[in-house]
From Swiss-Prot:
This is Uncharacterized protein ORF8.
Amino acid sequence: MSGDKYNRAMITAIGDHFIAMKPFHLCCERCKELIPHIENKEVVKHVAAMVELFIDDKDNFDMDIDIDHHIMFNLIYTFKTNKMGKSKSFTNIILSHVPLSEGGGKCQLLAALVKRMSEDFYRNNYDAKDVNIYHANSQGVLSIETALRDKYDKGIHEHTWPLKNITDITSLEHVERFIQEEFVVSTSNREELSFAIMKYIPALIQIAKEWFEDNDEVKIYVIPTGHGLLPGQMGMSITSGGSLKIRYGLEIHYADEDNERHCQNGYHFGSQSLMTLNALTAALKRMNDISIVCIVKRDMNVNVSFMCSCAKSAINSIQ
């Protein structure tokens, strides 16, 4: 897939929503792909160093990264958009076409990028108030696709979202409907679940802006549900001003071999053991000052409305 074709795909995906973009490619050494000329060389050097670290430092990943496959990143960095009469800065990271072999560490790479962006970008004072992270395919839609291997243009996943579903949250009236309609992902693939959660980050930042005062810390608790899937292993903390801090890590831990023990502890919210209010309250107490709970559905038998009601009641009971 040529660079020109790749850039056109990205323009299709985000051109309707942002007024400027500066795409470039970053690849592993074996690919020797050219990085198109852009003005800010320091940004190129900084991101290139991050990607190089991810590839070389395999101790950070549960699975080795297969660098025989092409790793391509497209960074849309530091540009202005005018929304509701206010000028804001965004840094948008597009992770597109990462055709690693199955089990090649895609989710670990994504989690590492989120963590590094939250630490390094703000520490280095780049002009970025929000960090949005998307996984896009060549058809111009966001996706949690994890099977893009061998060829770039294959593998459109059934779970896809137009970009507008993520960015068009402009008022409190939209928030509850957005949560009910968009904050539910049904998937049986564990790797896909990590990509699905990444989709929520820009929306969670927008919700925090709507619900809380500037610079208030907003703690978000993400609850994945399904057979053999434990809650309480993923949390994030952001400020309503837009600063994103991954406080508790992005990896979601699974314990299929430990189901019985966790069921006894009341933390197994599987398809056959729907979570109760008491179990959810106990889980939420592991984090203080919860502001937002995001429910991620992994099993079709899970009653999302009941879960959301439990989450609201649990939050009220511990505040």
